[in-house]
Design a protein with these regions (language model features):
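Alpha-helical scaffold segments in soluble metabolic enzymes
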Residues: 10, 14, 83, 87, ...
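Structured helix-beta-strand junction loops
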Residues: 18, 42-43, 62, 147, ...
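Internal, active-site/partner-interface "lid" segment
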Residues: 79, 91-131
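SAM-dependent methyltransferases
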Residues: 121-162
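Structured adenosyl-cofactor binding patch, chiefly the S-adenosyl-L-methionine
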Residues: 55-101
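Short, flexible loop/turn segments with low-complexity composition
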Residues: 21, 96-102, 158-160
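S-adenosyl-L-methionine/SAH cofactor-binding core of RNA-modifying enzymes
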Residues: 1-51, 56, 93
Length: 162
């Protein structure tokens, strides 16, 4: 089942103002954190979600961009839309402490994965929290975090280091 073009285009045209229009589709460019930052700067965004087989291909002429959230198929674009809404919302002022955003995976400063996180107890089934994190030496902790971020990125997402 393919969704008709006419009701979707009418809905897009009825939106007050000029929202940035995105069609969610497996054929779109892959969504990344850099796109979240770009969308954060937009005044408004309209997300078009297909379902089952998607939407009439003519819709592509009425949107600004086509985005895919990954190389997999969902039954509909609603979950993909929620992913985009969440990733953009958390970048809005006041949503999350701006200092916290700087050290996250895919931060604008460095494109590394975030360093490993630990909590209590210090030892769990013979696995211990790294001693440097218990040292209280913030300079050493910062160096450890940076090194671990690079290690994790190299291990899990080497494509980010290119």
């Amino acid at each position: 089942m393919v969704m008709k073009a006419e009701p979707i285009v009418k809905a897009l045209e009825s939106i007050k103002g000029k929202p940035y229009k995105i069609l969610l589709s497996a054929s779109g460019r892959t969504y990344k954190q850099s796109i979240s930052r770009k969308l954060r700067a937009k005044n408004s965004v309209a997300l078009v979600c297909g379902h089952y087989e998607g939407v009439d291909a003519r819709i592509e002429k009425f949107v600004d961009e086509i985005i895919s959230v990954g190389d997999f198929i969902l039954t509909g674009g609603e979950i993909a839309a929620m992913t985009i809404v969440d990733s953009v919302t958390r970048l809005l002022p006041g949503a999350i402490d701006s200092e916290s955003l700087k050290s996250e995976s895919f931060s604008k400063i460095e494109n590394y994965l975030e360093y490993p996180q630990y909590t209590r107890p210090e030892t769990f089934r013979t696995l211990t929290v790294p001693a440097v994190l218990l040292s209280g030496n913030h300079e050493r902790i910062d160096k450890w975090r940076k090194l671990e971020s690079i290690k994790r990125t190299r291990k899990f997402r080497p494509d980010l280091l290119k």
